[in-house]
């Protein structure tokens, strides 16, 4: 069978399961499995068929069984899970997608490359890096960075391609959440891998892990987990009805209503992201052309990089020209959109995703890190001068992670004079304010807000699904209707008057009111 035939047959089986036509679904799945050489899946289906036959036999005999509904749900669940694995197994044999090439290469990984073993390597990184800093010329740092990044990559790819966690996998994954030595960026990357894996195939253990991760103390981790839960439910809107223990955990998380409020915020951010193309068009056709038409005004505006602080005020004549040109309205509109959380930088950075760094899928999900080898290569371990200013800007919450990497790679390849000019035009912050400890601290605090972190992560995901080289291999949820409040498992959590008012507003600006 080719990919299309596999997908169509799988969807037919799923439709039968949703309609609770279990016997027909099992018959279709049996035929489906004849194309697969996986005897484990065949045995699992045979056991499910036998259990269902016994249940029907007892019903015909009039035997009362108070556990019948529970047993039926378990048989239906098992049948669905077998169908999931059968689909992947068959696609592994014919698909050229990166995900399936990863699955086909999983057997080449040494058995000792489990989550726990990789965790130990990652945990050693901070100490190894500290030792290198004490050595002359940071001796050995390249090897330490390479080892760390390759290990994080293996963990990401092996987690993404593992469609069915064992109990041992789940336990080891919980160890990552409990570790006090694991670098936060590595845990963030792992959280994204769990989400990607759930997008390919529903796995109760991974979903349960995300529910654990939502309560993690680190904001970057718990916000990624929240977004991961939203994506998993958008990809599998009805599956949780088969797992009452997961539904119960969702309800427990929302006992005080805080989980619902946070998930609702993620919901709004996802809805807002669907308006990015409109904003992008507005930027390209209205705002940027207006700025280009008034380039002389822009050039004569004072952005805080002048030697004489007394000259920092805008010349009144230029200010008058600035307002009469209409440029002031355009810039204010852009600022308002940005304050609302809109993705105003997509048009700017869309053309800057061709660097080699972005050829690897996992790099799209790695939090920005000035100590990443690709950044150290361009700016050194301790940025100075204009690079230090750039570093401060990158600590703010103005750009998502992938845009920060793009900005660094772009800055590294332009002359110093142009770099200074670009920095002055990319921020309205005064240089003194940037270098002032209290104000730079305020920027960092802004960047650490949960709503800023989750919104920037949604921007990262949007770029991955729209711009990555392998974007056509993924289902783009941003092209579809996003209706989290209609998902059965979330009705009691999101369908509350104070929350419904927010996501049913006609525009992002209204939603924020």
For each feature predicted by the language model, list its residue ranges:
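Alpha-helical solenoid scaffolds in large eukaryotic transport, assembly, and signaling factors
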Residues: 136-187, 192-205
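Non-TPR docking regions that flank or precede TPR/alpha-solenoid scaffolds in eukaryotic proteins
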Residues: 6-8, 21-27, 34-129, 149-153, ...
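Generic start-of-chain signal for non-secretory N-termini
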Residues: 1-11
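Conserved small/polar residues in nucleotide/adenosyl-binding loops
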Residues: 503-512
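Hydrophobic/aromatic side-chain positions at a characteristic register within alpha-helices
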Residues: 17, 198-202, 500-501
């Amino acid at each position: 069978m080719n990919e299309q035939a596999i997908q169509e047959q799988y969807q037919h089986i799923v439709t039968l399961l949703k309609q609770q036509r279990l016997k027909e679904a099992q018959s279709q799945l049996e035929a489906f499995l004849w194309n697969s050489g996986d005897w484990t899946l065949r045995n699992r289906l045979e056991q499910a068929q036998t259990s269902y036959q016994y249940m029907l036999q007892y019903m015909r005999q009039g035997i009362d069984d108070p556990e019948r509904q529970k047993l039926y749900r378990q048989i239906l669940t098992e049948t669905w899970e077998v169908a999931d694995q059968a689909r992947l197994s068959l696609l592994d044999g014919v698909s050229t997608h990166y995900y399936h090439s990863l699955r086909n290469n999983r057997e080449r990984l040494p058995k000792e490359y489990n989550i726990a073993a990789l965790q130990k390597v990652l945990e050693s990184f901070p100490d190894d890096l500290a030792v290198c800093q004490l050595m002359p010329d940071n001796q050995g740092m390249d090897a330490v960075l390479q080892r760390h990044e390759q290990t994080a990559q293996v963990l990401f790819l092996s987690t993404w391609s593992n469609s069915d966690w064992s109990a041992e996998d789940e336990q080891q994954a919980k160890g990552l959440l409990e570790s006090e030595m694991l670098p936060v960026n590595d845990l963030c990357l792992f959280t994204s891998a769990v989400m990607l894996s759930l997008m390919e195939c529903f796995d109760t253990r991974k979903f349960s892990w995300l529910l654990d991760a939502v309560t993690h103390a680190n904001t970057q981790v718990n916000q990624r987990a929240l977004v991961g839960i939203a994506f998993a439910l958008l990809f599998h809107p009805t599956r949780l009805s088969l797992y009452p223990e997961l539904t119960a955990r969702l309800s427990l998380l929302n006992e005080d209503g805080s989980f619902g409020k946070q998930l609702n915020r993620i919901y709004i951010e996802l809805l807002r992201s669907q308006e990015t193309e409109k904003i992008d068009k507005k930027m390209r056709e209205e705002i940027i052309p207006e700025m280009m038409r008034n380039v002389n005004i822009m050039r004569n505006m004072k952005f805080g990089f002048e030697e004489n602080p007394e000259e920092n005020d805008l010349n009144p004549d230029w200010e008058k020209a600035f307002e009469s040109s209409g440029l002031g309205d355009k810039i204010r509109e852009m600022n308002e959109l940005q304050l609302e959380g809109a993705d105003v930088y997509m048009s700017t950075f869309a053309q800057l995703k061709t660097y080699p760094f972005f050829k690897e899928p996992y790099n799209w999900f790695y939090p920005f890190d000035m100590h990443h080898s690709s950044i150290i290569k361009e700016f050194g371990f301790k940025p100075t001068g204009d690079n230090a200013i750039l570093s401060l800007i990158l600590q703010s919450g103005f750009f998502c992670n992938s845009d920060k990497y793009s900005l660094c790679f772009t800055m590294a390849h332009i002359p110093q004079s142009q770099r200074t000019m670009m920095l002055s035009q990319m921020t309205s912050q005064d240089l003194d304010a940037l270098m002032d400890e209290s104000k730079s601290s305020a920027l960092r605090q802004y960047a650490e807000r949960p709503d800023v972190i989750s919104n920037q992560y949604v921007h990262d995901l949007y770029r991955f699904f729209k711009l990555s080289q392998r974007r056509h291999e993924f289902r783009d949820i941003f092209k579809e209707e996003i209706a989290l409040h209609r998902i059965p498992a979330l009705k009691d959590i999101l369908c509350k008057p104070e929350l419904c008012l927010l996501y049913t507003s006609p525009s992002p600006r209204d939603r924020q009111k």
